[in-house]
Regions:
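A glycine-rich helix N-cap at a beta->alpha junction
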Residues: 84-87, 159-173
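Short secondary-structure junction motifs
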Residues: 51-54, 138, 142, 169
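Short acidic/His/Gly/Ser-rich catalytic and metal-binding motifs that mark active-site loops
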Residues: 102-107
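Beta-hairpin (beta-strand-turn-beta-strand) motif
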Residues: 61, 97-101
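N-terminal amphipathic, basic helical "cap/leader" segment at the start of enzyme domains
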Residues: 1-93
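Short Asp/Glu-rich motifs
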Residues: 61, 155-156, 162
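Active-site-flanking beta-strand signature of metal-NTP-handling nucleotidyl enzymes
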Residues: 92-97, 172
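Small-aliphatic-rich amphipathic alpha-helix that forms the alpha element of a beta-alpha
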Residues: 42, 110-158
Length: 173
């Protein structure tokens, strides 16, 4: 049996997805396109009980620089400045969160599964990260996945205005 062209195209995108660390501010698509991709895939990525606990904030330009300066500062200089500067040199960053208020609501509504909702939320967030990263690859947008949290959580909240109920999961410069 021959696999169809849709599968082959999908497989090619997955196979080509890699961490890109040599970032710059030039995008092959508009910032609005990037935001649309993130919004669309946040809505379309499945999760248990359709809880929709995944959240994302996209920052560009000066706000991107503020995010990476805040990350550097949160570590009191214990991370390599060249590394955070390299991420800040990119066009933007996607910040991935889990909305804990959604999880709490689901736990109250479905008590028998209460201990599973945090696990399912992490799984769904991982799928979202993969979906967006792969979509970026298909658009020629380089990215990587970073995990400076929880050390940076409060600093990121201050820079972005993210609600206290949102738990930072990952950063994709």
């Amino acid at each position: 049996m021959a696999l169809n062209s849709d599968y082959q195209a999908f497989k090619n995108v997955v196979a080509a997805r890699r961490s890109v660390y040599a970032l710059n501010a030039d995008l092959p698509v508009s910032e609005d396109d990037i935001v649309s991709v993130v919004k669309d895939l946040t809505e379309l990525t499945p999760d248990a009980f359709n809880q929709k606990s995944a959240r994302a904030i996209v920052v560009f330009g000066e706000k991107n620089r503020e995010v990476w300066d805040a990350i550097y500062d949160a570590f009191d200089g214990k991370v390599d400045r060249a590394k955070t500067d390299a991420f800040a040199a990119g066009a933007g960053t996607v910040l991935y969160f889990i909305d804990r208020s959604i999880i709490q609501s689901m736990q109250e509504q479905y008590v028998l599964y209460a201990d599973r909702f945090p696990v399912w939320a992490q799984q769904a967030n991982g799928m979202l990260q993969f979906n967006i990263w792969s979509a970026f690859r298909s658009l020629g947008v380089g990215a990587s996945l970073q995990h400076y949290n929880p050390v940076i959580d409060e600093a990121i909240r201050e820079v972005t205005g993210a609600p206290a109920s949102w738990e930072l999961v990952a950063q994709a410069p």
